[in-house]
Amino acid sequence: MDFAISLPDPGLTAAIQHRIDRKTKPLGALGRIEALALQLGLIQQTAAPRIRQPHVLVFAGDHGAARAGISAFPQDVTWQMVENFLAGGAAVNVFCRQTELALTVIDSGVNHDFGRRDGLVDAKIAPGTANYIETPAMSAQQRDAALARGRELAHALAVNGCNLVGFGEMGIGNTASASLLTHCLTGIDLATVTGRGTGLDDAGLARKHRLLAQALARGGRPSDPLGALAEYGGFEIAMMAGAMLGAAEKRMTLLIDGFIVTSALLVAQAIAPAILPYCVFAHRSKEPGHTAQLAHLRVEPLMELDLRLGEGTGAALAFPLVQAAANFLNDMASFDSAGVDDRV
């Protein structure tokens, strides 16, 4: 599957930077907000970028390996949390309402029948992946279907005028899948990128390490993104990667959440490296593997709040900073318009 992603044309860099520098402030005084404004301008190819119809997509899916005790919570919590999202009661709902972000939940592969519901897209590939400790998590056909469906979802948002999408996820056991994918695609030691997830105690963490070692003994360490995704991925991770790639094809800004979302980005970036300039990294998760992922990508997140919830909460919390970067570039007076002396 080919994705047509073009790198942002750097030809506008000087013009956008000049506009930033002429605002009524010392050079660089707004720090990383200035860098973010430049990034938005390059993504949108304008010196006056605007955020339109921003949207958070929360991808949900179940993992066969969860039944082996790889998580602190039972698998049923996946569908129960989807119900919580649909009822508006989760943390991501609260933060999206606060910032007037639209929120849609994507059933990528939850082991539950939700029926037709407002705010839910039924994109179920299957009711959960296979147990990757025993067999590949998904077939090549399932993987490709998930990638394609994610791409379609992003393109549909673009048609409706959206130019910024935040990514979130829900799936009991998906931190383990993210650890395996990160290990495969970066070569970072598995122990370094394996943490407590939803709150494993010491015994649970030791069990998680054993189970992931068993998975690797069976499936090896495929370094190609499609192979790694089929062996160890989740349907929500695969569909999210497809949506990221589709969003970048449409020159949308991608607001990246924490550890699991970044594992999907590692897949997407390995497929199409040109995706990276479209990404804004919301925060640094407390999950230890996230710091390793960010270092591998050589990026710095906007915030460090010790978050480890997922759901897209970090993306929703970071959105006002992205909006502020666009607003500053468009609405702040320049030395010329304000009649302020800029001589040093």
From Swiss-Prot:
E.C. numbers: 2.4.2.21
Signal peptide: none
PANTHER family (alphabetical): NICOTINATE-NUCLEOTIDE--DIMETHYLBENZIMIDAZOLE PHOSPHORIBOSYLTRANSFERASE
Designated name of the protein: Nicotinate-nucleotide--dimethylbenzimidazole phosphoribosyltransferase
Function (record text): Catalyzes the synthesis of alpha-ribazole-5'-phosphate from nicotinate mononucleotide (NAMN) and 5,6-dimethylbenzimidazole (DMB).
InterPro entries from the UniProt entry: Nict_dMeBzImd_PRibTrfase, Nict_dMeBzImd_PRibTrfase_bact, Nict_dMeBzImd_PRibTrfase_N, Nict_dMeBzImd_PRibTrfase_sf
Keyword Glycosyltransferase listed: yes
Transferase is among the record's keywords: yes
Family: Belongs to the CobT family.
Entry-linked SUPFAM superfamilies: Nicotinate mononucleotide:5,6-dimethylbenzimidazole phosphoribosyltransferase (CobT)
Gene3D superfamilies referenced in this protein's UniProt entry, alphabetically: 1.10.1610.10, 3.40.50.10210
